[in-house]
Amino acid sequence: MKRKLTGLFGAPVSDRENSMTAGPRGPLLMQDIYFLEQMAHFDREVIPERRMHAKGSGAFGTFTVTNDITKYTCASIFAEVGKQTEMFARFSTVAGERGAGDAERDIRGFALKFYTDEGNWDLVGNNTPVFFFRDPKLFPSLNHVVKRNPKTNMKDPQANWDFWTLLPEALHQITILMTDRGIPKGFRNMHGFGSHTYSMYNDKGERFWVKFHHRTQQGIENYSAEEAEQVMAKDRDSSQRDLFNNIEQGNFPKWKMYIQVMTEEQARNHKDNPFDLTKVWYKDEYPLIEVGEFELNRNPENYFQDVEQAAFAPTNIVPGLDFSPDKMLQGRLFSYGDTQRYRLGVNHWQIPVNQPKGVGMENICPFSRDGHMRILDNNQGASTHYYPNSNGAFEDQPQYKKPALDIQGQAYEYDFREDDDNYFEQPGKLFRLLSSEEQQILFNNTANEMSPVTDALKHRHIRHCYKADPAYGQGVAEAMGIDINEVDLDVAD
């Protein structure tokens, strides 16, 4: 049975195709209210795109606990082996706009939202375990250099590489990005990482530092630079198509979740800053501990409703999980929620994909009121709108207080380079883990990506690579057609 057309407020529509005019060939009349309503809505259809991670794909699924980690955390989501929790995942490219090609060389976003029975837990990460820098003050500049030049409105490799090579700590991330892992074949075929150091605490109040790893069960598959060009020439939505079609066909992708755990005592004695996002924790020192598995098994019915309006923020945590002194994480605690309030409004938590389904909307009792689009909870009705109050309308839940975190030091803008200038050890170790064929691919990809930039930037990058491993610097120089003897390798970084 066909549905009968109405306007937004229920009035029947008599003619969807023909506007009201003064005579059959006369001008349009402004009293054609359906035309006005449709055009006014159309003019406002597009909401601001994300400043980063603009183009994404998403799916719903289920997380299942497969190993007991209750000695580390009292979070209910991990309470017992076999416990299941509904979830939503969003994958994305990072630098590109909404129309970006899925097979571009770029980091991939890997954001997870778990609808736990203690509230939503958002684990916001990428497909790499590290990042370009370790201070969030650099975030706006990173965005600017990977986006478009303000004069030409074109991508600007010179600005991009100038910024990256002025940050020697970026070499670790750059090295990963310039391997074939910089272009995953699809979202199903890549690992994910929480990247930041988070913390867990148990029912005894003991705190542990943790890193999250999500290992694909479909196997790692990547495109070469040449393959990626061919794919994008035919299909700019290749990763989204792959994810959507496989789920529709019942071929549900799965990932295993693991954690690395570091005690507070180990952190105090760790060689490097354990909260430095440009470095990893070595697995031989902090082995992977299995936590669970998640499966994505349902596509959204409407992309805009569930994927475009999905709002992730690392501030969405639950009892038993907490933050760390990681400065990048601390910066994201503000920025993520703030961008969602700008994109979607202060009441974006009422959008279905963002609702705390595991708790139930009827049990949500925030103290916030009003704001654009406050529609689902009667705006708390006539209940008391201040606290404390004499009628006992609300009460805290002190049993969920977090254990104390020992923080010491004087407030100051510390130069992190004076604290830790060990930029090149881990990129060097990563380079030596690559096969000779993979190393050559790294050289060639780097030379290709840097081909538009000046020799001064090439020399700077070669110097960083050389400091990580002489063979790394030599290989990049040869791929660029540069005599390494012409590069000043002794400049301090």
From Swiss-Prot:
CDD domains: catalase_clade_3 (cd08156). The gene is katA. The active site is at 53, 126. It comes from the Bacteria. Pfam families: Catalase (PF00199), Catalase-rel (PF06628). The keyword Ribosomal protein does not apply. Gene3D superfamilies: Catalase core domain. Its cofactor is heme. GO terms for cellular component: cytoplasm. Heme binds at residue 336. It comes from Staphylococcus xylosus. This is Catalase A. It is an enzyme of class 1 (oxidoreductase). Homodimer.
